[in-house]
Curated annotation (Swiss-Prot):
UniProt topological domain (Cytoplasmic) ranges: 1, 114-123, 170-266
Record family assignment: Belongs to the palI/RIM9 family.
Gene designation per UniProt: RIM9
High-level lineage: Eukaryota, Fungi, Dikarya, Ascomycota, Saccharomycotina
Function: Required for the proteolytic cleavage of the transcription factor RIM101 in response to alkaline ambient pH.
Keyword tags: Cell membrane, Membrane, Transmembrane, Transmembrane helix
Name of the protein in question: pH-response regulator protein palI/RIM9
Organism: Eremothecium gossypii (strain ATCC 10895 / CBS 109.51 / FGSC 9923 / NRRL Y-1056)
GO cellular component terms listed in the entry, alphabetical order: cell division site; growing cell tip; plasma membrane
Coiled-coil stretches noted in the UniProt entry, renumbered to this chain: none
Main location: membrane
Length: 266
């Protein structure tokens, strides 16, 4: 559970949480939030879903993108001008902000669920792949904000760059965690092999079990017969071993000496 998380797991969860928070600042800007803006210029405050007039506190309806005719919606207003010479059609790309936020929410949920349950290579691989998609969307958000509002880009726009860096950092942490799990699994398998070696090592050294027969694989009836026959063949002496040369045996009593001729066994 989350109470026993390691430092690496805390870093992964913390980086994704901060990235989600920073993206929320930029997405929920004016007119959703009057105090948070992507840019302010010439009496206007710009956000993802519209803009507001700071003088008369008027805001456009919620929509994606800006239009030059928006300034004439209120009496006494001039034509709306963007901080840069970018075309108004480029402001339609602000749609990547809510898309990136949704991807970030999904990434954050996957990280939280991975902390609550046992880690697996599959879950971490999905997190790594999804974080790459989230990073591309977050970086695109920052580029759109730069093209539209630089040099009047406010701090929520710059937080998108920080969020992109945090997504890369969290992806690196997930890669490190996945590599650690793989190494632990390999070490565990090697340890189990060492523990099983006293059980099967003697049989392998005596030639009872061939190299092709893994000790982890259960024996079939045919393999048992094969192993038994090979074991019996090694236990029975060969014909050459049965042949014993003639030996001269000397009795313990030095006064009696006899030569006993031992004939070879047939």
């Amino acid at each position: 559970m989350m109470g026993g998380m390691s430092v690496v797991e805390w870093l992964l969860l913390g980086s994704t949480t901060l990235a989600l928070l920073f993206q929320s600042f930029a997405t929920f800007s004016v007119p959703l939030s009057n105090g948070v803006t992507l840019s302010h210029f010439n009496g206007y405050k710009f956000g993802v879903f519209g803009w507001c007039d700071t003088t008369h506190t008027h805001c456009t309806p919620l929509k994606l993108g800006y239009s030059a005719e928006d300034g004439f919606l209120f009496a006494g207003q001039d034509e709306l001008s963007l901080p840069t010479q970018a075309k108004y059609s480029l402001s339609k790309l602000l749609v990547v902000h809510p898309l990136a936020l949704c991807s970030m929410v999904v990434l954050w949920l996957m990280v939280v669920l991975s902390q609550c349950y046992k880690h697996s290579d599959r879950r971490l691989t999905i997190i790594i792949l999804w974080s790459f998609l989230t990073y591309m969307e977050t970086l695109l958000c920052f580029l759109v904000d730069v093209l539209l509002f630089v040099p009047y880009l406010d701090w929520p726009g710059w937080l998108m760059l920080v969020s992109a860096v945090l997504v890369v950092f969290s992806s690196s942490i997930a890669c490190l965690r996945r590599r650690t799990l793989t190494s632990q699994r390999i070490e565990k398998g090697a340890k189990e092999d060492l523990e099983l070696y006293p059980l099967y090592g003697g049989a392998l050294g005596a030639g009872v079990v061939s190299d092709s027969e893994s000790p982890h694989r259960p024996y079939t009836e045919g393999s048992i017969i094969s192993v038994t026959s090979r074991a019996s063949s090694r236990l029975l002496p060969s014909a050459s071993e049965l042949e014993t040369p003639r030996e001269e045996l000397t009795l313990m009593d030095p006064s009696i000496k006899c030569h006993i001729e031992r004939s070879p066994m047939s």
